[in-house]
Design a protein with these regions (language model features):
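Membrane-interfacial terminal anchoring regions of lipid-handling membrane enzymes
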Residues: 2-7, 13-284, 289-610
Length: 610
């Protein structure tokens, strides 16, 4: 049954604004969980950096030796790939002696062909260890209290200055933190997360839409939620900038070089992540691996770093078992240090890089079917303009913290105890126990990682907070598709936006139908709605169009002089529409009931690059 059939019974159009509220309120401003920065796990790890690197080197070497019977092939393949990397994509941040290093290793590996089997094995181990150590010293960052305090003060004053300058009212200076809190709104299980910080290790896994995500998440967790700094990955290319390199080198970031695809580097990176978690370091990483190119909430996650959380939990279980000197009854046995996974969903009215990201996505998926049009700039000037306008205009940014889980995807309570779907208590160590002991089984842990990824994806969708801009973009693009149902996606995107009008009455009626569907999904706890979604459709439509892609030169949607809706850019409209894909909304509305108008009698797909 479609929404159109249900609306008259369940959600009368005249009372749609009276839908019960979920009573979501932004969290208050919290003090720091740990008053002293030298108590932070990331600082303690940095203080023991040399020993930490030694642990990485030793662990990675042992694993590679055990998993790769032919070390010669492993080394030669690594040298080959690294030499290609240096020739085809050199970066300013690369060490000046990089090519010399790999040339020397190539000369040494050739000499092993004349050595005895045992001599060659020892030489191979030595060479692999040298490679690992070069990688580990590059990857592992540091954390400086002085630099952190400077960065915190700088960001606070920077945002404060923008707020006052943009508002042109200096008397608001004293309330700037509260006004920033109004712009960056935080919802969810914050109290529980703060409690769990003192009981175990917290790993925050956010959705990823924009390059500004890292700054906003870090700022919100520090200034609003009061959490200590997390370890996080930063692309090595960012270190090409001297200023960026200075700060990231000293703020707990570990460096990730996405050019390096060889097995030794990837194993070293995963080992670093796993051992840092075992040492108690709270970590943040984007499980999707990169920004969402199509604008959808992630449905597929990268298993590499996510798997290190599962492995780290097993290692912690092993350590806990080793500390026990006698057998303890099942009812009284102590739990090991727990790892808690916290999904975090970012919700924006805008993504500065949206035109660039969707163009990349369409070029990859459409290939010859997709013809690129004009693009907006993504320069430093555009970024500065974006930051300025963000503070000059009220455009919400939402951070929704999900309910914490253990590494198996089971929910935990405020004490950190795990429970299954029937609310039965669980011991996390049971998942890693075979014949009475905690055992390593990498294949089993791969399956656990897949289960965890599925749970995170599910929570990403359930914790997603729908904004007014999401609903108007979703509605508009589905109207466009229904009114041009003979075209495939790429032909649809080649249509000239100037030829189409979304009549205000038809658009408003379609918005009402989508509202009905969203209320049903909210009732089933499939997603969350911002309070503005409960307003009458006309008000919701006005707010959504006003906020949608507010910083883009070519607007996804805008009002024309007659009060109807038009679009400057179907590609970007498609991007923002995708935010509500994968929720089953499309099939709940009879889109053919909502007609569009054309300015000309006949229109054809655009065939020239514009």
């Amino acid at each position: 049954m479609t929404v159109d059939n249900l609306s008259a019974v369940n959600y009368p159009l005249s009372t749609i604004h009276c839908q019960p509220s979920t009573a979501m309120q932004p969290v208050k401003l919290y003090p720091s969980v740990f008053e002293r920065i030298d108590q932070w796990p990331i600082y303690k790890l940095s203080q023991d950096r040399r020993r930490f690197i030694e642990e990485i080197d030793e662990f990675t070497l042992n694993r590679l030796v055990n998993e790769h019977p032919k070390l010669y092939n492993l080394i030669t393949e690594t040298i080959y790939l690294e030499r290609i990397r240096l020739k085809e994509s050199p970066w300013k941040v690369d060490p000046p002696n990089e090519m010399q290093f790999w040339n020397r290793l190539r000369a040494k590996i050739v000499k092993t062909e004349s050595e005895t089997k045992q001599q060659a094995l020892e030489t191979h181990k030595e060479l692999i260890l040298r490679i690992i150590h070069r990688y580990s010293t590059e990857i592992v960052g540091t954390f400086s209290i002085a630099t952190f305090r400077f960065a915190r003060l700088f960001l606070y004053n920077f945002f404060n200055r923008l707020l006052n300058a943009a508002a042109e009212r200096w008397w608001r200076f004293l309330s700037s933190r509260n006004r920033l809190h109004e712009r960056i709104q935080v919802y969810g299980e914050v109290e529980m997360i703060r409690d769990l910080m003192k009981k175990g290790i917290v790993i925050v896994v956010p959705t990823h839409f924009s390059n500004i995500d890292s700054i906003l998440v870090g700022f919100a967790m520090d200034q609003i939620v009061g959490l200590p700094s997390f370890s996080y990955g930063a692309g090595l290319n960012l270190y090409n900038s001297g200023a960026a390199a200075f700060f990231m080198n000293r703020l707990g970031a570990y460096r990730v070089d996405r050019r390096k695809k060889n097995a030794i580097y990837l194993e070293t990176l995963k080992t670093m992540s796993m051992l840092s978690i075992v040492r108690g370091t709270n970590t943040l990483f984007f499980p999707g691996g990169t920004r969402s190119r199509n604008g959808m909430v992630e449905t597929r996650l990268k298993m590499g770093l996510l798997g290190t959380a599962v492995e780290a939990q097993r290692v912690l279980c092993e350590q806990n078992l080793a500390k026990e000197n006698k057998k303890i009854s099942e009812s009284t046995r102590p739990e090991p240090t727990k790892i808690y996974i916290v999904p975090l969903v970012m919700s924006y009215h805008f993504v500065l890089e949206a035109p660039f990201l969707i163009r990349q996505h369409l070029q990859i998926t459409g290939k010859e079917k997709y013809i690129a049009g004009r693009s907006e700039g993504n320069s430093i000037r555009e970024w500065l303009k974006f930051i300025w306008q963000f503070f000059a205009k009220k455009s919400d940014i939402i951070l929704s913290f999900g309910k914490p889980m253990d590494v198996m995807g089971n929910f935990v309570d405020e004490n950190g105890d795990s429970f299954d779907a029937r609310n039965n208590p669980l011991h996390i160590s049971d998942y890693f126990t075979t014949e009475g002991g905690v055992t390593q089984d990498l294949q089993r842990e791969e399956e656990y990682t897949k289960l965890l990824a599925e749970r995170i994806v599910d929570r990403f969708h359930r914790e997603n907070i729908v904004l007014s801009s999401h609903i108007v973009a979703f509605t508009a693009f589905n109207m466009l598709r229904a009114n041009n149902d003979t075209f495939d996606l790429y032909a649809l995107l080649r249509l000239l936006p100037d030829d189409f009008i979304f009549p205000i009455e038809s658009f408003t009626a379609a918005i009402e139908a989508v509202q009905h569907a969203l209320f049903e999904l909210e009732e089933k706890k499939r997603l969350k709605l911002s309070d503005i979604i409960r307003l009458p459709a006309a008000q919701l439509l006005e707010d959504g169009v006003k906020n949608l892609g507010v910083y883009h030169v070519r607007k996804p949607l805008l009002f024309n002089k007659k009060g109807d809706i038009e679009s400057d850019d179907f590609n970007t409209l498609f991007y923002y529409h995708n935010r509500l894909e994968n929720f089953g909304l499309t099939k709940r509305v009879r889109w053919e009931n909502y007609k569009m108008e054309m300015r000309i009698g006949e229109f054809k797909p655009e065939t020239e690059i514009i």
